[in-house]
Amino acid sequence: MTAPSSSSSASMARANFELNNAIIPLSSTTLDSIFAYDNEAQRAILHAQPWKTDPHFFQKVRISAVALIKMVMHARSGGIYEIMGLMQGKIDVENRTLYVMDSFALPVEGTETRVNAQNEAYEYMVQYLDHSKEVGRLENVVGWYHSHPGYGCWLSGIDVNTQRTNQQFQDPFVAIVIDPNRTISSGKVDIGAFRTFPEGYTSSSSIGGGDSEYQSIPLSKIEDFGVHANEYYPLEVEHFKSSLDGKLLDLLWNKYWQNTLSQSPLVSNRAYTTSQIRDLADKLAQTNAAVLNRNSVSSAPFTTTAGAASVRIGAGKDVAAETEQNSGGSAKDTPAGTAQDAAGLVKEFEQRSKMSAISRASNDAAKLASEANHGLLASQLKHTLFHNHTATPTPASASAPTPIRL
C-alpha cells in the first residue's frame, strides 16, 4: 500500500475542513457583488440605520474562509486564556446579513474567564484601520470576536455589556465567540454569533441566546449563562470562500497538513477532556443530592425546581375549583378543555424533563462519548493509512493454479 503524497494529504485535510464547516464556494457572478465595496452605499446604509427600529433586524452572519481560519488559529494560540480581535466587513440590508471579510487580533490581556482591552489595544486598532485604508481595504469594523476555551459559545455578563456598548456607539456590530477546545474535539469549528437587545427590551419570542439549542455549560458557568441568556439572540452563521481564498487555503494546508496527521485530538485535548469528565461528575453528584433531598413524592424526578412547579400546578387547580364553585358549577370541564389541559400538562412535564439536571448530565455524557469516538476513529484511520502495508500479489503468483489436496 503506497502512502499518499503530501499534496494529496493536504488536499484531503482541506477538503475535510471545508466539508465539516459547510464552506460555500462562491460563483463568479456572486463573487463580484460580495467583494466589491461600495463606500457611498455603505454610508447611506449607516445613515438610514434600519436596525434601530427592529432589535431582530440582522439574522445572518457570513464569514469568509480566511477570516474564519485566522480567528480559529488565534483562539487556539491562546490556550486556556481568552483572546480578542476585531472583524472587518460590510452590511447587506436586503438580506439582513453582516459580511465578515477579514479579521485581526488585538494585543489584550486575557485570563481563563475574561479578556480586557487596554489603551495599547485601542491604539493598535486605530493604527491598523488607518493602514488598511491606505492599502485600499475600505471595510469598516463590523464586530469583535473572542474565545471561550472549553465552555461553549454564549455571552457572559461582561460580554453582554461590551456588546451592548458597541451596538450603542458603533452599530451595526456583532459579537462572535469561538471555543477552540471543542473545535479540536469535534473536528468542526464551534462558533456562535450574537447581538444584544436594547436595555429594557423584552423579546416577544421565548428563544434567547441561551435557548437556541442545548449547550454543555460547566457547572461554574451555569449561573452566569442563565442570568443573561434572554438579553441577546443568536444569528445564523455561514462560511464562504472565493477562488483567492482557495489559493490561500492551499498554501496554509501545504504548511500545516503534517500537524493534522501527526497530532491526535485525544492527546492534544486531554486536559479539556479531563475537565469535562470532572464537571460531569460534579453535575451527577449534585443531581444525586437533589434526589435524596426531595420532600414530596409528587416532585418530578431529578429536578430541583420540581417542588415549586408542583406547587404552581396545585395552586392552579385550587383557583379553577374556586372559580367553578363561585360560578355555581356552570364552568364544567368539556372534553375539548380536558384534552387541552392534558396536552399542556404533558408539554410542561416534557420541558421540565429536558431542563432537568439528569437530562443535562445525560446529554453531556453523550457529547463526551461522541467526541472520544471521533478521536478514536481518527487515530484508527491514520493507523490504517500508514501502518497496515498489505502486500499486493504479483501477477505471477496471482495466476498460479491452486494445488488440489486429495
Curated annotation (Swiss-Prot):
Name of the protein this chain belongs to: COP9 signalosome complex subunit 5
The chain positions of domain MPN read: 61-200
Function, as annotated? Catalytic Component of the COP9 signalosome (CSN) complex that acts as an regulator of the ubiquitin (Ubl) conjugation pathway by mediating the deneddylation of the cullin subunit of SCF-type E3 ubiquitin-protein ligase complexes.
Annotated SUPFAM superfamilies: JAB1/MPN domain
Q: What is known of its domains?
A: The JAMM motif is essential for the protease activity of the CSN complex resulting in deneddylation of cullins. It constitutes the catalytic center of the complex.
Keyword Cytoplasm (UniProt): yes
Region: Disordered, residue numbers: 320-341
* PANTHER family registered for this protein in UniProt: EUKARYOTIC TRANSLATION INITIATION FACTOR 3 -RELATED
MF-aspect GO terms: deNEDDylase activity; metal ion binding; metallopeptidase activity
Q: Where in the cell is it found?
A: Cytoplasm; Nucleus
What GO terms fall under cellular component here? COP9 signalosome; cytoplasm
Native organism is Mycosarcoma maydis
Per UniProt, subunit arrangement is: Component of the COP9 signalosome (CSN) complex.
